[in-house]
UniProtKB/Swiss-Prot annotation:
Belongs to the SdhE FAD assembly factor family. The gene is sdhE. This is FAD assembly factor SdhE. The keyword Chaperone applies. One of its GO terms (biological process) is succinate metabolic process. InterPro entries: SDH, SDH_sf, SdhE_FAD_assembly_factor.
Amino acid sequence: MYSAEEKARVKWACRRGMLELDVVIMPFFDECFEELTEAEQQAFVSLLECDDPDLFTWVMGHGRSDNLAHASMVDKIVEHNLSKLR
């Protein structure tokens, strides 16, 4: 599991160069990160290392990551945000 300091670093990494990604990724981190499995947390952190244009494409559903862990995490992020609209 992540220490408080490590979580703070992950939260900082959630801040992207695109507001559109901030609006999608930050709430997921705040509301879901603690409940993810260790493998899912690692996939989330790894996902944050991807370039913003790629993340935006995946989140918008215009493409899919070749990395299965990233694709699965994007699905979780999108589903979380869609569930808030229902």
